[in-house]
Each structure stands twice: as C-alpha cells, then as structure tokens.
Amino acid sequence: MNDETFDVALWGLDWDSIERNEHMLQGSVALMDGELILDIPFGTLFKRKEITQQLDEARCLPALYGFDLKGKYCALRNILPVTCEEHFPGGTHEVCKAQYYMISDSAFNPSGRIVKLRCRFSHLDQWAGSKLSALYSVTEEGQVAVSLKEIPSDSITLLQAEWGSIDVVYSVTRRSLTSTSLEIGVGSHVDFTFNEPVYFDAAIRDFLVPFGAFLSFCMGTRASIEKLSSIPYGTAKCVRIAAPFPSPSKGNVFSPEMPIVLSWLSKASVPLTENWLGSDDELKAACNLAASLLVCDSGKEIASFFLESAQLLEMMAKYKHEKKRFSDEELKRRIDLVRSSVSRLDREVRDWVHNRLNEANGYGQHRLLTDLLKSLGEFVEWLIPNKKSFLSMHVEMRNSLTHRDSAGTARYDPQMLAAHSQGVLVLSYGAILIRLGLSDDEVIDIVKHSRFARIARKFRGLYPSN
C-alpha cells in the first residue's frame, strides 16, 4: 500500500472506555516506509497496568480502539512497542507499530467475522481490460466526436464455489469539470463474497493472499494491494483497512506483456483460478515461488536468481514423482550385499559406504529432470530443441553454483547464465500450468504472446537442435 497519514484519534481498550474518558491516549497513525506506526506524543501505552494485562505471549496487544477527529470509529490490530523515550520527567513519547488500521462510520469487531472483502490490486485495470471502449470521429465542421460504449456486464465471475465467489467488478465514474469538459474514470476491483461469514484473519490468509499470488503469477509482476475494505457480518457499513502490504511496483505493465490476462483466462480449457486455489500444498509452494521470482527476477544477483529458478524446477521435477527407486525389501537386499562386500575394508571406508547407502533410495537430479521434460510433451519440444545439451549444462551449473565453486563459476558468461536462468523460470512456469490442467498448446500460446517470448527466443538459441 502507498504511504498515508490518518487523522489524530483518542485511543483506549474499547470504545466505551473512551466515551467514559477512561485510560485514553492521543495518537496519530501513519503508514510509511512499509510500517504502520502509532505515534503517541505524550504518554505511554505499554507501561500501563490495564494494557499489560491484555498482552499475549509475544507481548503484543491484540487490539486498540479509537475515535478520530471526524467522529469515525478506528481500530488497530496486533500492536507492538518500538521506542519509548522520556524527554523530561513525566513527559514520555512512545512509538508503536501495528498490523492493521481499520476505520468505519459505525462500531465493528476488528477481528470478527465478515461477509465480503473488496480489494484493488495494482495493474488490475490492465489485466482485466477496460469497461469502456471509445470511438473517435471527425464531423464535417472539423469537430471531434467521441462515442463511449460500456461493456455489457458490470462484473466477471472468476470463481463460483460452495464458500462463495470471486468477482472482478468494473466501475465508471463521471464528473463534470467545467461547462466544456467532462472527466470519466474507469476502474476495477476484486470482490470476495462469502456465503457464510468467515473471520477476517481467515479471509486474508485463505483467500486474499493466495489470490494475490495467483494474480502476480498471471500478470508476471507483483499484484500489490492498493486498497482494501470489508463488510462485517451483521452490518452494511464498510470498514476501510490499511496495512503494510508491499508497495506497488512503479510504472505501468501493459496487458500484451502479461502472460495471462482476464480475457484469456475466461477462454481457458480448465478453471485455472479454481485449480490454483484448490491445489495441494506441494504445488501451491511451487506456484508461490514462481510468483515471487516473476516479481523479483530483474533485481537479483544472477547466481542467486539461477539457484532459485533451479530450485523451482527441482520442485516441479519432484512433484508427484515416485519417491523410492526400490521397494524396502529390494533396498535391504542390495544394502546387505554391499555391506558384506566391504566388510573387510577399514572402518572409515565402511562408515563412508554405509552413510552413502542411507541415501541410496532416491532419484538423482538428472533422472528427475529427465522425467519432468518427458512429461511436458510438446511444450518442451518447442522450448528446448536440444534437451540433452540443456540437461548437461543445467546440472553442471547447479552443482558449481550451489557449492560456490569459484573456478567453475568463472566459466559461465553472465549473459548466458542470465538467459539460462530466465529460460528455466519460463520452463517451470509452463510446468506449473500443465500441472494445473492446461494443454501444451495453451502453454505455448501463453509464452509466444507475452513478455516470455523474448526469453524463449534467447533460451532456444542456447540449446539449438543438432
């Protein structure tokens, strides 16, 4: 979220205590530099007995309630002390940080159940497409005529499930500026509507954060939370929420650069949103790593980016791959045979062999990657013309860079290493999409018609067919 300063408020343990003038403190809240700060210019919060009695095991105050200068109801969640300074006897200045700042026109439970979350993500307008289309024409008198046409629907449902729905909602605002001009604003946001009330923390953890990762995965850049609000259970009053979510990336990302946009998603052969949110923990971990690498790839040191891309590829190689090469009985037979063969060797050698045997029932990196490439069919045939050369180089680079072999690392040209690393990320991206149910042709289409096309062209050039 962007930095913002909020109105000064009176704070207490609950709204009733403030109305009774009990245990009040005056303080201002600001969201700045990635932190949500409560600044108490005169007084201390965490040295009061009535406060310390409310602290949890982590010395965190679960909630603080307030009224601001405009008479609105405010609340802070999960407050921790940062600094406490005494400028003169009795003149204490305290600074605290919090996880959430909430504000509404009526009283609410800051950790209670809600029936709706509404979120605006960065780059969402480009991803979702405009609600308006404009037609320009020139009259015989030389005047420009503009005709605006709205799309038929005000919203598009991304997911309909037993728990509720996820919808992209469009909005158009019109405001006259002067007698000769008109300002028209076009925007979009995402609604999470719950059929049964859910607790706020669960809604953030189970729906908002995973969907944000899905959007980042589709956009190829961070889908940051710019605005957030909720509708508590039992009231129609909206609660606005501020929190130190990562700030939006600077500059626009145009939809032709994005791997998967909303219009493509609506025509996919499988319900990709549902498959992503419903994936098992192992695949979800790979999905989240891919989303974070897509966001950070341009700012990382090349060797570190390669290792994280290689880790992602290895996660996909191990996904649903059989864990054991041999049955327990066959493994025991082989181990007994080897042990009997080395029984006459000195103890140090025997111990070394026995330690190696404990790791002898897994699959090596080369075998796992070979099986993965075979399973990805036409996508890999198109992306990597020479799979043998790619596998050999990738395993060699991974071993050298993992163990920080300086002599080996120096052999790799930085541009080649960067092109290989980005290609591995695209390969892993395609593997995830195929595991989520898309066809090879759909994945190839995504790569060809997004910013991945440039990466794929360089990657294919590294490993041309013989």
State where each predicted segment sits.
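Amphipathic, oligomerization/interface secondary-structure segments
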Residues: 250-466
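Charged, non-catalytic interaction/linker regions at domain boundaries
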Residues: 2-288, 298-300, 414-458
